[in-house]
Amino acid sequence: MALLEIIHYPSKILRTISKEVVSFDAKFHQQLDDMHETMIASEGIGLAAIQVGLPLRMLLINLPREDGVQHKEDCLEIINPKFIETKGSIMFKEGCLSVPGFYEEVERFEKVKIEYQNRFAKVKVLEASELLAVAIQHEIDHLNGVLFVDKLSILKRKKFEKELKELNKNPKNKS
C-alpha cells in the first residue's frame, strides 16, 4: 500500500467531474486500499478519489466507533453512487482534507438513500442519516467537482477566502 498526495483547494483538479468506474480489477482494488491508508493517515472520515487525483466515481467513508477508533471492516467503499431518495434538512459543521484547517456549518439532507457498487461491482442500497448522510453527500459532491465551501453563504465564503489569504501569506502558520 502507498500513501497518496491529497490535493488542496484551490487546485482546479478538485473541480473535475469524475467518470464512472468500469473496471473492478486488481489495480482498482489497490487504488481503494491506497485511498483508505491515505484517509486514515490524514485523520479523515471520508475521501473521494478526485482528492488524490483519480477522476473516478469512487469514495470511502470510515466513521469511528464509540471508542473513537476507525476499523477497516467498517469502511464503506462506495463506487458509482446515485441518490435514490433524500429527506429533511440538517445543519452540520464540516471540514475537508482538501481544505485543511477550515470548518463551517453547511446545510445538507438529514437522510439519504443511495444505490452504489462495492469493490466487486455488486449493486447495493444504503440508507443513511445524520453524520453518515452528511459524509455521503460531502463526498458525492467531490465526484461532481463541488466543495463544501461552495455551499457557504456569501458572508461565510468571504470569511473563508480571507482566512485562506492569511494562511497563504504566512505559510509557517500551516499545520
UniProtKB/Swiss-Prot annotation:
Secretion signal span: none
UniProt KW Iron keyword: yes
Keywords: Hydrolase, Iron, Metal-binding, Protein biosynthesis
GO biological process, one term: co-translational protein modification
Catalysis performed (reactions): N-terminal N-formyl-L-methionyl-[peptide] + H2O = N-terminal L-methionyl-[peptide] + formate
Keyword Oxidoreductase: no
Organism: Helicobacter acinonychis (strain Sheeba)
Cofactor note text: Binds 1 Fe(2+) ion.
Residue sites binding Fe cation per the record: 96, 138, 142
Name of the protein in question: Peptide deformylase
Enzyme class: hydrolase
InterPro entries for this protein: Peptide_deformylase, Peptide_deformylase_sf
Highest taxon in the source lineage: Bacteria
Species lineage: Bacteria, Pseudomonadati, Campylobacterota, Epsilonproteobacteria, Campylobacterales
Active site: 139
Protein EC: 3.5.1.88
CDD domains in the record: Pep_deformylase
GO molecular function, one term: metal ion binding
Cofactor: Fe(2+)
SUPFAM superfamilies: Peptide deformylase
This protein's encoding gene: def
UniProt family annotation: Belongs to the polypeptide deformylase family.
Reported function: Removes the formyl group from the N-terminal Met of newly synthesized proteins. Requires at least a dipeptide for an efficient rate of reaction. N-terminal L-methionine is a prerequisite for activity but the enzyme has broad specificity at other positions.
Entries under HAMAP family matching the protein: Pep_deformylase (MF_00163)
